[in-house]
Regions:
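Bacterial N-terminal signal peptides that target proteins for export
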Residues: 1-11
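N-terminal edge beta-strand
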Residues: 24-43
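Extracytoplasmic/periplasmic copper-protein system
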Residues: 26-30, 110-126
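Short, surface-exposed alpha-helix to beta-strand junction/turn motifs within ectodomains of secreted
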Residues: 48, 53-75
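Aromatic sugar-binding surface patches on proteins
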Residues: 82-88
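A glycine-anchored, Pro-Gly-centered beta-turn/N-cap motif
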Residues: 90, 95-104
Length: 126
């Protein structure tokens, strides 16, 4: 192999090694209010969830369920227009108890993520 061919091979190897790799990440839940596995003494008016990527509003859903398996949210889950990583749903009149938040989102990379987490509302101390 000539020195010119060796130089070309070395340059091509460097270009391939330094090229950015495609991203294969999915939209991950990075923060929520109430937090995952948290206990609060004041019932939230809304459950809010922030994700690692922008969400597709038409394919995002969230629901809140009580211990008896009854849906207790207002059915108004939506992606925030000013923050496309924020999905929230109203939770009127939550009493003390354990709640499960279920969500399903489609991120702009085309991947569906479906999961759930719990939080607890505890009666305030008297």
């Amino acid at each position: 192999m000539t020195s010119r061919q060796s130089l070309i091979v070395a340059m091509l190897t460097a270009v391939i090694a330094l090229a950015p790799a495609p991203s294969f990440s999915h939209s991950l839940l990075v923060r929520s209010q109430p937090g995952q596995r948290s206990t609060v003494t004041r019932p939230p008016e809304r459950v809010q969830m922030w994700f690692s990527e922008r969400l597709e509003p038409a394919y995002a859903s969230a629901s809140v369920w009580n211990e008896a398996g009854k849906r207790v949210d207002a059915g108004d889950a939506s992606v925030d227009q000013n923050d496309p990583t924020l999905l929230s749903v109203s939770t009127p009149n939550l009493g003390p108890g354990r709640y499960t938040v279920r969500f399903r989102v489609l991120s702009v990379d085309g991947h569906v993520v479906e999961s759930s987490y719990i939080f607890t509302v505890r009666a305030p101390a008297r």
